Amino acid sequence: MSMFKEFRDFAMRGNVVDLAVGVIIGAAFGKIVSSLVANIIMPPLGLLIGGVDFKQFSWILKPADGAAPAVVMEYGVFLQTVFDFVIVAFAIFMAIKLMNRLYTKKEVEKPVAKPSAEETLLSEIRDLLKEQNGKAQ
């Protein structure tokens, strides 16, 4: 029973719960971005290059032969996945940049400390010695 208690304590610590929430939200955010890329960005981009759907871009490495299916390299799907990644990475970058801006504490300028009584006295003695040396020459 103690192993179960240890596991429960571990799982309920703040960091683990925060991480789990972050992963779940990240997965949902990834789906939103994938939909944005597939349904909003890629169709106009395909239209600009001649009305082609990126998912259709592929190279047939070996045609189908009887019962053996064709060997196809679908680089269009890969390109769409790369666009997904770039947009997700940019969105995360912007979110972190915003969070850093919100949480960055501006350094408060420290007031210049007044010299202590000893320092003031030593400065006066130094100045007097300079005056005396200047008059003696």
Swiss-Prot record:
Keywords, sorted A to Z: Cell inner membrane, Cell membrane, Ion channel, Ion transport, Membrane, Transmembrane, Transmembrane helix, Transport
Zinc-finger in keyword set: no
Transmembrane segments: 10-30, 76-96
Cellular component per GO, a single term: plasma membrane
Disulfide bridge map: none
GO MF annotation terms: mechanosensitive monoatomic ion channel activity
Source organism, top-level taxon: Bacteria
The keyword S-adenosyl-L-methionine belongs to this UniProt entry's keyword annotation: no
Membrane-topology descriptor: Multi-pass membrane protein
Subcellular localization: Cell inner membrane
Main subcellular location of this protein, as a coarse class: membrane
General function of this protein: Channel that opens in response to stretch forces in the membrane lipid bilayer. May participate in the regulation of osmotic pressure changes within the cell.
Quaternary structure (record): Homopentamer.
Similarity field: Belongs to the MscL family.
Protein name per the record: Large-conductance mechanosensitive channel
Gene that encodes the chain: mscL
